[in-house]
Amino acid sequence: MKCVHILCFAVITFCWIWMLPLLIVGAVFSIPLAIITLTISILISLTLQWWFHGTILPNNVLRRWISCCPWHEWFPCNTIRIADVSVVAVHPHGVLCCGALAGIHFVPESQTVFCVAPVLFFVPVLGWCVRALGCIPARYDIMLLALRKGHSLIVVPGGVPELVMSEVGDDYKTFERSGFIRLAREAQVPIQSVFVKGECQTYDMWKAPFHVNRVHLSWKLNIPLVFPLFLGWYGTWLPKRTPLVLKTQRMESTTQEEYYSYLKRLQQEK
């Protein structure tokens, strides 16, 4: 037998005899390691949340470094600079809020603050960095504090229900809410409404049954009830290179009915 044959024979017999026992032993020993890692991660997340409670970091070095990358060229999309303190309401949500992130938040010299789901702050590694990226928990008191400190606030009013609605790929479907309107009124700042044409085409999603029921239940539970398979650029997790068009309109104090009436007109503009 040649050396290569002996080597092949050794590998095959090793796998045949030892692979299953090693997998079983590895699985058994990985359970305590996973529990320890999870416990440490949760403790770190809780400590950071307590330590940085109410802290707003719109100009952290990590965000400045990430903003140097021309993210808007990926799709491509136009960019919007927010000059005055305002509530920037972006529609629709889509999967990743690509228009809001690439076209407004991660733009060089942008000082906006992005409202995200509070649970993100407890995700290991990502949650430890998300505040340094200019994000705050989407809680009314913290959002109001940010506005009173002079920071423009990016909100995606449709939230989780609108993420579920993006299954159908229709940018014009919105889940109406009024909390951000009350917020702007209380802080006495205008609303900058932004419509992102093409947002729902950045990913292909599986159209599961009971769509209307899942949208309603997602709103109640604040959990996106969708099949966790998002196909982007060439089937990867990257968003598709779909051109995005950001349209914007400034609105002063308004009601929910008036706001969504203005939004429909903005959506229809060419």
Question: What residues fall within each predicted segment?
Answer:
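Catalytic cores of glycan-processing enzymes that make or break glycosidic bonds
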Residues: 34-46, 65, 111, 124, ...
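Non-catalytic C-terminal accessory region of glycerolipid acyltransferases
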Residues: 145-270
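Catalytic core of membrane glycerolipid acyltransferases/transacylases, capturing the structured
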Residues: 41-60, 81-149, 160-175
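A short, well-structured juxtamembrane/interface segment
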Residues: 61-84
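Compositionally biased, charge-rich terminal segments
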Residues: 1-4, 44-57, 202-217
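Short, conserved catalytic or adaptor-binding loops enriched in Gly and charged residues
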Residues: 63-69, 106-107, 129, 238-239
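Alpha-helical bilayer-embedded segments of polytopic membrane proteins, i.e.
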Residues: 1-45
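A residue-level signal for beta-strand positions that form part of recognition/binding surfaces
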Residues: 71, 85, 111, 152, ...
